[in-house]
Amino acid sequence: PVDIDRLLIVTFTNAAAGEMRQRIRDALEARAEEAPENAHLQRQLVLIHNAQITTIHSFCLQVLRSHFHMIGLDPGFRIADEGEMLLLRQDVLKETLEEAYELGAGEVNTAEAEEFRQLLEQLAPGKDDQAVQNALLQVYQFSLGQPWPDEWLAGCRMAYCRPDKEETTPEPDWVRFAVKDTKRVLADVREEILYAITLCQAERGPYMYEKAMRDDLAMVEVLQEADGYRELAKAFAVSGTYTRLSTKKDESVLKEQKEQVQELRAGIKDARASVRVQYFYDRPEVLEETFYASGVVVRALTRLVERFMEKLTEKKREKNVLDFSDLEHLALEILVVHDETGTQASPAALEYAEQFEEIMIDEYQDSNLVQELILNSVAGRGRGEANRFMVGDVKQSIYRFRLACPELFLEKYQTYRERENACRIDLHKNFRSRSEVLDGVNEIFRQIMTENLGGIVYDKDAMLYPGAVFAPDSGEARRLPEFLLLDPEDQDKQEAEARLVGMRIQQMVGSFPVWDAKLSAYRPLAYRDIVILLRTVSGWAETFGEVLGDMGIPCFTGSQKGYFSAVEVRTVLAYLEVLDNPVQDIPLAAVMRSPIGGFSDEALAKLRSASEEQRFYDCCIAYRDNGEDAGLRLALDTFFRQMEYFREKAAYTPIHLLLWEILDVTGYGAYAAALPAGRQRKANLDMLVEKAIAYEATSYRGLYHFIRYIESLKRYEVDYGEASPGTESDDTVRIMSIHKSKGLEFPVVFVSGLGKQFNETELRGRLALHSSFGIGCDYVDTTLRLRQPSLLKKVIQKTSALENLGEELRILYVAMTRAKEKLILTGAVPNASQKLEAWQTLNIRAMETLSYSTLTKASSYLDWVLPALLQHSGEDCFLLRVLSAEDLLEESREAKASDLWRVLEHPKEEPEARRYLERVFSEGYPYEQEQAISGKVSVTELKKQTELPEEHEGLELYP
């Protein structure tokens, strides 16, 4: 047996590590109760408190705390928060560019200075250098995903060095990729041509088209035989034009088959044209020249990034702070000896390797290259032993934006069965979902997940097999997964789709049976059993939340956006800006118009028009001193006195205490809490105070830097989402992103927004980055003012597009596998009927998987899911419904009528409501006597009342 403190167990999050530790402790305690005499179990219960069950960052932190002296690190370092690092990077970026400007403007015209000037001219020809700043930070952030960023940057620069003319160099990897990708497309095209020829030869087929299709086949086969990029380019150049389809008319030919061949021909021509435009858009000699000429940008930019990294490291050492990237790279520096001969474990790594009997890695598919090297260095017990146990599912690798490298997993997945000292264990069973859900997932992904897209063939080894046990039910519930395709017509797509989802929820809640493991019985579906998963919640969760709320469906969005746009947060931040610098017109007007100032629009207009001063602040001061309206002058005096009081306090008061006093003295905190959604607003203001406390723990001080701190968070979209005063445990429908749902499970899952276009912003930037291929950019002719992407940039863009599509495929897989009992896919697309016809044409021949071209041309999840369902009709695995906006309206009417009749026929007994109503209707009116008293009494009546007999002397009068 092995003691638990001799294992290194690494997982993805602190929460997962804590849960794993607790589960192991619970299991040990249970076993110890069964065998109290077992000394080994008792020992593990003691050792588990020191067991290395941790995240990779926590392990790296421990390495740094123990071996700080090896790299000259001050042991008192702390981890900077994201806001502080944003400020620090901005300060260093400014210094770096100022140095570069001084060099570029210097009298000595060095090559570096000239290249920097060209960098500015090509990336930032306008009035500012924001594009250069963005490019520098983009390359810097990307380089941190490489084990040795300096080497990667140098390699990117070296790629643009011309080889000697006498030197024969092999084609670079990125050129070979262009050839490989072209061959994949050509293979698809050839299959399409062969199928078209089959249709031509069929009974009543368009035989007159066969010659043209055979000419196409010959052309494609010539291209396929070309070896290497230059031969392919030459083959494309001489391939000539297409033979026209025959115009011969024959009534015996079926119109449908004729149109099918025409559509196939159009697709064949498009595919060939697209690959030519992608990789062979000019002569190889010209493309080679433009490639080397574009290197000026990469050389200048990589030097800037290197200088930026040096200065940032100096600043961080001065302030004795590290960020999370430093944890990994400094730990790598301690654990790995890296030189021109290669890499090997350091003495420190060998010490750890001796300590750990086994390295266990959870969620291995999300590891990156740096983490792989770190864990590999402490594995093998220093003697090359195979003692790593890795668990993961590459189909769920969805963190490419964090530079996760699923290729690490795939390499082991593909080789471990053949290696002597390795073993691959396939875990086929799924213990979450019903067989109907799994059958639906398998039906779709066996057709769309391939080695070329997604990284793995979805074969019998990758498929899901049911392992969960559900008690038999009545069989009345329709448990097949559903696909609801909506044509919104002239309605807003998001709102229409949200209504569709809401209607389906209303139909299911209270009637659809779900298995409750705690009750060991079926019960009606509740709102808390339902989740709506979206690819992105920004702009979608708000719409779904509003629509569902209007339909009476409680929902919890947990949105990650909206905090800095909340009116109460904007108001307080504007006040802080005014305290820092009162001559800012917009923040000053915002605060004065808010409840803090209490000035009306008319008052602000009067202040602006009463003075010729240009700044609004000066207008206010002038009116305060000499204005006509005494009331307005008094209000201004009160406002500015209070503002000056807070300005003086800001000089020596911690920001969080200043915020508390502002909210208290101005009354704005109480005001916000009294508004509708007051709990939410109060929570938002409390969060702002918490952010101030976090800021005060940084190396920055003062109100000015706090405002910069917040502005940096806003600029780089580090939005924390509105603070939530509620909890996810309430009986509400949850709306969340697919990424947030990873690792979770829900009885009923709606995967919505499938018609949303994939985000391709990354592919349209000035730079294209790749860990293996380097940096691609545009060739710019500054004389002719022409811009053209280099071949390397085109290759990286295509590579990134394929990697993005593979990521989207895996994200869809994660979403669909969250469902336990019912899976419902929804999407809205205009002209749905026409789209269906277009998707149907992709399936005119039965294929085991969709073609490479079909998969890579997808612009939304619908472009994968619907062709896959239409391919084999999917009737046994999915219920497919196409609805129009009118259908939606009609179903809504029917649902409302059905709900009304259900209430009338089967009224629900509510004991508490019954008791309340009985009490209200049975109680007498407590002020019955006062009803006889008049609200108004005339003088005559009063005179009469003075003459009342003695028995009425005690009667009170209420004026």
What residue ranges belong to the model's regions?
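Conserved motor-region signature of P-loop NTPase helicases/translocases
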Residues: 1-26, 81-87, 91, 98, ...
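P-loop NTPase Walker
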Residues: 1-72, 315, 319-325, 330-333, ...
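Conserved ATP-dependent motor core of P-loop NTPases, especially the RecA-like helicase ATPase domain
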Residues: 4, 11-15, 25-232, 318, ...
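Conserved ATP-driven helicase/translocase motor core recognized via long
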Residues: 6, 130-322, 422, 499, ...
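Core structural elements
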Residues: 48-62, 123-147, 301-307, 322-335, ...
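Active-site-adjacent bridging/hinge elements
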Residues: 62-68, 279-282, 301-309, 384-388, ...
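Cytochrome P450 core scaffold surrounding the K-helix E-X-X-R motif
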Residues: 71, 755-765
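Conserved catalytic motifs of ABC-family nucleotide-binding domains
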Residues: 761-802
